[in-house]
A protein has these predicted regions:
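Contiguous, often N-terminal, cationic amphipathic patches that form binding interfaces
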Residues: 1-46, 50-54, 62, 68-73, ...
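The alpha-helix within a helix-turn-helix
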Residues: 57
Length: 106
């Protein structure tokens, strides 16, 4: 696994590329060093950012208050910080995408 997930003493950081306005919210694979996530919410008034935080929170079973957009609030490329998480569950989820074809750039 490349630099998609970085574990730090205070938690972990994950680099994501989001595609808002999709039919459903789901991880679809990787694009370079980014985890590619389709979001059902549109990129309007922070709806896509809220959807991303909700999705990561539910996916990792952590409170929403522990999930933050560290950088990229207005960009498709973001760094998400999850407080007090060692990354075990996230790495397990992402490992299922490691053997699949790379996601093509859109």
């Amino acid at each position: 696994m490349s630099a998609r997930v970085l574990t730090k003493p205070q938690g972990l950081s994950i680099s994501v590329k989001v595609v808002p306005g999709a039919s459903k919210t789901v991880i679809v694979g990787f694009e370079g060093d980014f985890v590619k996530i389709r979001l059902a919410a549109p990129p309007v008034d922070g709806k896509a950012n809220r959807e991303l935080i909700d999705y990561i929170s539910k996916l990792l079973s952590v409170p929403k208050s522990k999930v933050h957009i560290q950088s990229g609030l207005t960009s498709k490329r973001k760094v998400i910080r999850i407080e007090n998480d060692d990354g075990t569950k996230l790495r397990e989820i992402l490992s299922s995408f490691e053997s699949t074809e790379p996601v093509k750039r859109s």
